[in-house]
């Protein structure tokens, strides 16, 4: 998958002040991710990979029996927001780094957790291999990521306008299972859940995506300014999905529990 990593970093850095106000789905998914595991068994050194503004980090601090927590994010303003939010907590290391290049030694982490962040990695197969490298024997990887049904309404609406890529592509359950197996993970539990969010308008959805930092970041996309005519054509096509004067947006979330 070809992603513009510099663009991703800029987008999330710019969204650090607005992220929490629109991240309800992210919080819901994070809670459900932790409910699927026995958090009291999360001990030792834990890594929140792609911590964003620190919601999952905070939940892990409250629920687990951690000794050391590492909060890692590619966008420094996001990491600073987490640090500010958790200023009264101890034994937390804040690391500004790319999840695809973990600055960690081998077999130093007991558990890696990640909530709706790994979809922004170019090569998940390499990411899983590196995660396995840093995990201790019997360590586990617990994460959620978006699946291919995500924003299919927006994708189909843009398809009526042109043939350019306007919506990010996401890996399927089958692809994720393959990558995990190739990386050496066993007994992976994979679950797909579809969430439908509803918005007053297509513009409201677009603004939420911007405030989340989740704009279109596929490298090689059409970088020309979208005309008003093209945008209106997309909106007209999208509004055909309207139900009770609201436009739906599908988010497929794939949750995974994998052990070394």
Predicted regions and their residues:
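Conserved alpha-helix/loop element of class I SAM-dependent methyltransferases that forms part
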Residues: 24-44, 59
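Conserved Class I S-adenosyl-L-methionine
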Residues: 53-55, 189-260
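A short glycine-rich, Lys/Arg-flanked "PGG" loop and its adjoining helix->strand segment in the class I
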Residues: 125-137
